[in-house]
């Protein structure tokens, strides 16, 4: 039996409105992004990396800032 797949291509905007709402970007965090759903009026957190990856990036960023002497932090 042959499997036939029929997909419709939709734009990002059409996809964001599929459930009747739109996700509005709020801020990026160490392990993900925070959005606000305009339909449900609730905040949505989408994890983009695991806890170990977030901790490792935080440590490395701290080391890099220390190595640069806090360049750009004191104006």
Swiss-Prot record:
GO cellular component: extracellular region; host cell plasma membrane; membrane
Membrane topology category: Single-pass membrane protein
Biological process according to GO: defense response to bacterium; killing of cells of another organism
Propeptide: 1-21
Compartmental location: Secreted; Host cell membrane
Protein name, UniProt field: Bacteriocin lactococcin-A
Residues spanning the membrane: 30-52
Described function: Kills Lactococci.
Predominant location: secreted
One family name in Pfam for this protein: Lactococcin
UniProtKB keywords: Antibiotic, Antimicrobial, Bacteriocin, Host cell membrane, Host membrane, Membrane, Plasmid, Secreted, Transmembrane, Transmembrane helix
């Amino acid at each position: 039996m042959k499997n036939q797949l029929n997909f419709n291509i939709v734009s990002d905007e059409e996809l964001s409105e599929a459930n009747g709402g739109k996700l509005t970007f709020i801020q990026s965090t160490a392990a993900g992004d925070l959005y606000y759903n305009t339909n449900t009026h609730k905040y949505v957190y989408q994890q983009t990396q695991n806890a170990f990856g977030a901790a490792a990036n935080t440590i490395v960023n701290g080391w890099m800032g220390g190595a640069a002497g806090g360049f750009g932090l004191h104006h």
